[in-house]
Design a protein with these regions (language model features):
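Extracellular/lumen-exposed scaffold segments
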Residues: 26-187
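Positively charged n-region of N-terminal signal peptides that target proteins for export
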Residues: 1-6
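Bacterial N-terminal signal peptides
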Residues: 10-27
């Protein structure tokens, strides 16, 4: 091979490799998503502000990517990871039991029996009491949401994400309802 031909060949080969890399880069870089990518969560309070000495609710809205599901709180099998929400209440606050929605029984190719799952948009509700001693102003209630997201092909590792419920506390007379579409009794 003549030097000029070798340079041309090397340059052409490099161009082809670059073109193939660009064409297939999305496939080469595609990764299995994480549980954090599959479920996007938002936190809302039923009162804005909430009244000192009163009660309110916190809603955690889970938006689950199409094609995925998470196990419901009432799981179908012992080995499954149930959806779980925990709160760490600061001084001046107490809370009740989390209200989980009823799951849907779905059949998947990997299981012989239907599984109790959440799909799409799911709302978890946590009742909270702001005691008469609750500090006024912006307060934070740390939350931890644990779930395991699965598709029909794979289950991702269990995921625990920290969330923050930001609540403004005012005198009881200033309390006003907020985000009622998330807290109506029909949901």
């Amino acid at each position: 091979m003549k030097p000029a031909t070798a340079v041309f060949f090397a340059g052409t080969l490099t161009a082809y490799i670059a073109a193939i890399t660009v064409l297939f880069a999305p496939a080469l870089n595609s990764q299995v998503p994480s549980g954090k990518d599959v479920v996007k969560s938002e936190v809302f309070a039923s009162m804005e502000p909430a009244g000192r000495g009163g009660s309110f609710q916190i809603a955690v809205v889970m938006n689950i990517r199409p094609g995925f599901h998470v196990n419901a709180r009432e799981k179908s099998d012992e080995y499954l990871i149930a959806t779980d929400l925990k709160a760490q209440f600061p001084s001046g606050f107490t809370g009740g039991e989390v209200v989980y929605p009823k799951g849907q029984l779905e059949t998947f190719t990997f299981s012989q029996k239907p599984l109790n799952v959440y799909q799409g948009r799911v709302i978890l509700r946590l009742p909270v009491n702001a005691l008469a001693t609750a500090p006024l102003g912006e307060q934070h209630i740390p939350l931890k949401l644990r779930y395991q997201a699965c598709s029909t092909e794979l289950c991702l590792p269990p995921t625990t994400i920290p969330l923050d419920a930001t609540i403004n506390i005012a005198d009881a007379s200033a309390a006003k309802p907020a985000h009622q579409e998330l807290f109506s009794s029909k949901r």
